[in-house]
């Protein structure tokens, strides 16, 4: 199981933009009910995909500039990056298998 990395403006380039692996960024906030409900699903995704991908989280309350830059309007938003570019987005509560399939499509 790979660890889920907290991303900030300071480490975004290193963790996401220049990463060779497919990277998923979970844009979330602590007050968002669906975000909280997705936490165990995201943990299961980490366990299922292991080191094949990099899984990250951005707390939009603490990192509003990242949310604004990527035009995040609805939480949670799962942005799938490949070669530093967003290749897919999933929004809202998403079943594990659907989120896993979306990520695996870019491996």
Descriptions of predicted regions:
Residues 14-15, 66, 102:
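CheY-like receiver
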Residues 27-41:
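Conserved redox-active cysteine motifs that mediate thiol-disulfide chemistry
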Residues 1-4, 44, 48, 100:
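N-terminal targeting signals for export/organelle localization
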Residues 8, 59-61:
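Conserved acidic residues
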Residues 4-23:
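A short beta-strand-turn-helix
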Residues 64, 70-79:
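Structural micro-motif
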Residues 74, 80-107:
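Non-catalytic, surface beta->alpha helical segment in thiol-disulfide oxidoreductase systems
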Residues 20-22, 39-58:
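Conserved helix-turn-beta segment immediately C-terminal to the redox Cys motif
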């Amino acid at each position: 199981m790979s660890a889920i990395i907290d991303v900030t403006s300071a480490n975004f380039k290193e963790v996401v933009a220049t990463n060779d692996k497919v990277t998923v960024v979970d844009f979330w906030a602590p007050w968002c009910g669906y975000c909280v409900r997705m936490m165990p699903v995201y943990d299961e995704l980490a366990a299922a995909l292991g080191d094949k991908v990099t899984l990250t989280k951005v707390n939009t309350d603490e990192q509003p500039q990242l949310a604004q830059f990527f035009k995040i309007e609805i939480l949670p938003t799962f942005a799938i990056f490949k070669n530093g570019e967003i290749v897919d987005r999933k929004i809202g509560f998403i079943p594990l298998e659907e989120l896993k399939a979306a990520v695996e499509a870019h491996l």
